[in-house]
């Protein structure tokens, strides 16, 4: 099993897509774990208000599903992912510098974040399946299960790293869970942990996907090559060297 994992990680396509996943999920873990602190201490929201904003966040995420799906009909998954993440990254950095001072601001931030968040959960699993076919073409092995399990391991690792980083940030900022009011430094860092810090990890995810070589055209070529191989014709792998 570990030998197969090692062989998979030698492939550029696998490294790029796993890197994109790991970086996004670290930022996602920080964003999700920080929300309650930010809403409670920075925004002084009541339990009812927090419930409403969480419901709005969920509604926005669901609303983006058909939009992301529609975008992939016009441009490929890779380009849609990059564009969505850039929108979220830029928007969250702007909010990080301007600050969030109202309930409406939280709603707008949620809208901006959900662009990239929805793109990740909708597109990256499909992109991972594209990697499975690239692996089959280049290595003559059907290892979809191994690729998916590797992704599951990376998700668990990313969540752990994100939560550890969140804990370190709060500790260094002087955050105290027992205090009714936090220091200015602690609230400054809970603000950054909801905006700029997740945006940094989104940007790293974008860089990985920019490097990721499977475009819509390349994927079509991979499927054609696999079809020729199954028909008994050995395809020329030279055009696919960048997948390796």
What is each residue range found by the language model?
Residues 1-244:
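Membrane-embedded alpha-helical bundles of multi-pass transporters/translocases
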């Amino acid at each position: 099993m570990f030998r197969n994992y090692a062989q998979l990680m030698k492939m550029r396509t696998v490294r790029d897509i796993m890197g994109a996943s790991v970086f996004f999920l670290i930022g996602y873990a920080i964003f999700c774990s920080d929300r309650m602190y930010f809403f409670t201490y920075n925004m002084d929201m009541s339990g009812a208000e927090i419930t409403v904003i969480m419901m709005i966040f969920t509604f926005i995420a669901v609303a983006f599903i058909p939009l992301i799906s529609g975008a992939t009909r016009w441009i490929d998954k890779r380009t849609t992912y990059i564009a969505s993440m850039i929108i979220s990254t830029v928007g969250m950095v702007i909010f990080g510098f301007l600050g969030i001072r109202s309930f409406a601001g939280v709603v707008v931030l949620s809208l901006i974040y959900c662009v990239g968040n929805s793109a990740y959960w909708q597109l990256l699993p499909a992109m991972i399946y594209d990697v499975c076919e690239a692996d089959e073409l280049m290595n003559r092995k059907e290892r979809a299960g191994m690729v998916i399990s590797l992704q599951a391991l990376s998700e668990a690792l990313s969540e752990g790293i994100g939560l550890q980083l969140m804990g370190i940030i709060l500790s260094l900022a002087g955050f105290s869970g027992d205090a009714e009011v936090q220091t200015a430094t602690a609230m400054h860092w809970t603000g950054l942990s909801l905006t700029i810090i997740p945006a940094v990890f989104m940007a790293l995810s974008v860089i990985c996907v920019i490097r990721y070589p499977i475009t819509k055209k390349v994927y079509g070529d991979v499927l054609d090559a696999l079809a020729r191989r199954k028909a008994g014709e050995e395809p020329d792998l030279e055009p696919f060297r960048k997948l390796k």
